Curated annotation (Swiss-Prot):
One of its GO terms (molecular function) is zinc ion binding. Residues 11-130 form the Arf-GAP domain. Signal peptide: none annotated. It comes from the Eukaryota. PANTHER family: ADP-RIBOSYLATION FACTOR GTPASE-ACTIVATING PROTEIN 1. GO terms for biological process: ascospore formation; regulation of ARF protein signal transduction; regulation of endocytosis. InterPro entries: ARFGAP/RecO, ArfGAP_dom, ArfGAP_dom_sf. The keyword Metal-binding applies. A zinc finger (C4-type) spans 28-51. This is Sporulation protein SPS18. Keywords: GTPase activation, Metal-binding, Sporulation, Zinc, Zinc-finger. Pfam families: ArfGap (PF01412). SUPFAM superfamilies: ArfGap/RecO-like zinc finger.
Amino acid sequence: MRLFENSKDMENRKRLLRAKKAAGNNNCFECKSVNPQFVSCSFGIFICVNCANLLRGMGTNIFCVKSITMDNFEEKDVRRVEKSGNNRFGSFLSKNGILQNGIPLREKYDNLFAKSYKRRLANEVRSNDINRNMYLGFNNFQQYTNGATSQIRDRTLREISNNSNASEGAEFVLPEKVLGSDNFQDCERFPACLSSERNLDENNVTSATSTLTIEKFQNDPIGTISRSWQLLSDALYKSYEDFKGSVVQPTIENIQQRNLPNDIKRSFVHFNEKLHETPHLPSPVFSCFTGGDILPPEFN
């Protein structure tokens, strides 16, 4: 097993040395010194030992550095170097207005354009189908930035570099057709299409939750039970609201509007009238209820 690993590493080193013989790769990408011995697995470029020490300080998530002679390489790392190279990455930076000299290293390699280059390079290594108009800095990016001055471009580059962490996984798609009246018409139609699609989705959800069958329960018992519980909860809540609106609130309002002292007086008057209609009851009964103030004349 060890022999197989050594042979694989030797084969990878041979491939890297062959890629190093290509035009532009025999010089350090940063300082242009001859015979670089390190490569960047992130961008697929060759760099010298001094520049490797500087770039390694930015972190492996931004700039991964490996030695050709001392480190082991995976297949994807070697393919990145073979597909990229110094000239291709340098032309990419020039096309996007990023100067190769005179700017800080972090601003050069940790920005939106560099991340776009790394994503496209990784997709090419995975042999995915790539739309060449999909990523910033390739082919038709120049028509997208016509009329922009270099000063505005540099300021924008610094701003998006500072905010790049918030949009780490975002993909940037360029328009496939020239901006014009057709695109503005598409923008006007977009809200209506979005609204119709949203209404269609809501109708589908409502119809799906309102019909519960045995087949659905067998296919998805947990989902069916959860939807049933949701329907039951909605029905109970609606019944509670109806009961509260038709019984509880009118009763409370009726109690608040009634004049209790007058009701008590009317009750005592009615009770007194009943006492006068029954004169044969003994005196303690009346004194118990009335205190002796409203006894009929027969008991005085």
